[in-house]
Amino acid sequence: MRSIILLLVCLFSICLKAQTEFRVYQKESKKSWYYISAPINGTKLNDILITTGDAGFYIKEHDFNELFPDHSFAKSKLKVRSIECFRKKYLVKNIFVGKFNVGNVCFVGNIFVLENSYPFTAKLDVQNLCNFSDSTKNVINLNFAEQKLAFVDMNAVDTTKLSKFDILSVYPSIVIKVPITIRQDGKMWNLEGNMRLYLSNAELIEFYPSKYLDEFCKQTKVKLIDVYDDYLDSYKAIRYDKLKIGTKYFPNHFIPIMKNFSIKNSFGSINGSFFKGNFYIDLKKNKLYYE
């Protein structure tokens, strides 16, 4: 009988923990700062500071064992670390791990949070993601409806469950990580790097950096931009006019930039949000679709 009562108590405790809810908010005095509040085991913890910068959001280091005395963080994944994507560093909050949905879009993997980087405004219902102790997993509801935050591990996107949607309704440019072959004076140059498309006017692309970039610019006398201020990093870039792309440097059977085109199995980013999969670019409508 005692064991049955203990079992019921444990189940009830788990149900209470399953109601854990995180909230992200700002204060009037500090508009650039964000905070998290969370009720844990009946105790509401406020003002867990998140700092924000060009790289996005991350939790400032706290003594989590002091904040959550009923939980052990010795073996949990509450560590803030830095990753590098496209030569930019982004801070990863490795607190949530698992699978979640935004509308019809399903992501699997770690979550990192970037400011205003994803054109979804939705409440994310996250299940079995947060490991507050060595043995307990809680169900957490995250409501970022006002903040427009993004969460995706670029190496763990389940592209089979992605529906087509317009991602340039908010942002006019995209960075795509692709290998590109350029024909110039009878030679072929394989440039492996990142390509930035400005689709609002479809006039320029920049391609940077690559194994052969310096040599390519030296021999072809293509203009090389020495410093490009992208908040987090400076890099070298080639800048082309669209006519040159269509006629000389990018023949149609490589990148038909004057027409709509698709890019398969590529990485892409839109203002910091990273995607892996297929892109379809409609230059007439100035739209880009992620398939």
What do the predicted segments below correspond to?
Residues 19-291:
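Pepsin/retropepsin-fold aspartyl endopeptidases
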